[in-house]
């Protein structure tokens, strides 16, 4: 990692976008647990960073600070951020930084008996599970464990590239207005 990105040593802290925005508002530098879980840098149970992975990849451990929980207070709005709006000191509640988990929290009736599909930059198919699923089958079939709100977990299968396919379809339909996915799949075969 360091050979490819020597500037990583100059960094003070790694913050995904949702955590960076919270830092700019509160001054608290932490990474929210649901977004951390999809980086593949947490222990399988999603409770802490996997420092063994950092060491093997040559990633400085100092970049990865505390984890925060969604739905819990994580600092207050700073005076400098409030800048005269009269909201300095108002508590900030962390949200699920991973967009799929935020969407799942709004899905009515989602429990361990139902599956979900999330469409965004990728296509995610999954189900709530009691604990992370760690076995040869899930690894072989490329399933991932996603940490959720309140200690929940989802076993998910990612189908990346949905956004790319949509952009391609947009361009192709300029030339062939009625182009559909079936025709694209047939041409790909």
Q: What does each model-identified segment do?
A:
Residues 1, 25, 41, 103-107, ...:
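Buried hydrophobic packing segments
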Residues 11-13, 32-42, 116-122, 176-188:
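Short alpha-helical "patches" and their helix-cap loops
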Residues 25-30, 77-80, 105-109, 127-132, ...:
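Short acidic, glycine/serine/threonine-rich loops at helix termini
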